Amino acid sequence: MTTKIFLVRHAEAEGNLFRVAHGQYDSVITPQGYRQLAYLRERFREERLDAVYGSDLTRTHIASALYVPRGLEFRPLPLLREIRLGVWEQLSWGQIQRMDKQMYVDFNKRPDLWRVEGAETFAQVRDRTLEGIRQIAAENPGGTVAAASHGAALRTLLGTLQGMSLEEIGQTGHGDNTAVSLLEVEGDNIRVVFRDDASHLPAAVSTFRRQSWHKDDAATEPGLWFRVAAEEDGSRTEEALLEEEVFGTISMALEPEALRITDYQLVPALRGQRYGIQLLGQAVQYARTQGREALILRCPEELKGYFAKYGFVSSGAEMVMDLRRIVREIPSLG
């Protein structure tokens, strides 16, 4: 009796967009991620599903694209969580490269060697995700199931099921957000039918089409790191650096329920290269650590479209971004 398990990587989340390390940090889906979910829902429209599982992190709960149309309950399974990143959690990838370039490379290229304080090893991730798949198969004999998980966890699991060592897995590719893989489970045998298929995503909606790190031989990318330049009475200014040179600043002020961005600067040479969104991500991170539920800013009319892409909405003369961890409606296609 064969059980089919569709593995789905979660939609684009804040860590993917802002280039921040989110392993088991509970981040949320971006507006672009919700657009990806609309295409994922369409891909599975004619597919019978008997159950939908996912890790217990918020960004996989948005598998609602699969279970809500079918009247199914979401089944959280912590065994499918992303790798725990220890002291790397919530650091920008630029900061991590600056701290330990070799360990950053090992994370992508030599997972067998990767060791970080407070983190899991990839061997531990391999073992628990395998346990999760076997549990799903045992609970759904002969059924067809979808299971939502995470990039590094899925890469490790799929490579293992294809007979690779951890060292060999470091030479395999990465799956885009909402990429789909298919397993067939019969007894103790688990076969990978296909993996990392994101053909349902148009280029304009793909996360990977806008990023280069996954194409690089060492999986590196130029990334900003941040340092506090000034802080006083609820106001804070951070500098954004590449290597040791300052290329931008962001100034913020705490209000009772929100964080106000009072200044947002990036040198012209870096504009249009996805560095500006890393500045915005730093503000989101800081707002969350301070318990604020919104970002507020004022900007010229010609920049409102830019901020609207990332979830800001106009409110009078200002724009507001809602930071609450809530499940939003998946848009319709067309």
Predicted segments, located by residue:
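Phosphate-coordination/substrate-recognition cap region in phosphate-metabolizing enzymes
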Residues: 38-104
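Conserved GNAT acetyl-CoA-binding A-motif
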Residues: 287-299
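C-terminal "cap" of GNAT-fold acetyltransferases
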Residues: 298-302, 310-334
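A short, internal acetyl-CoA/4′-phosphopantetheine-binding micro-motif in the GNAT/acyltransferase core
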Residues: 79, 264-271
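Acidic, low-complexity terminal tails and accessory targeting/binding regions
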Residues: 2-3, 87-95, 160-229, 325-334
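Loop-to-helix element that buttresses phosphate recognition and phosphoryl-transfer chemistry
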Residues: 9-62, 116-130
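Conserved acetyl-CoA pyrophosphate-binding loop and the N-cap/start of the following alpha-helix
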Residues: 32, 270, 274-282
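Conserved beta-strand in the GNAT
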Residues: 239, 245-253, 260-265
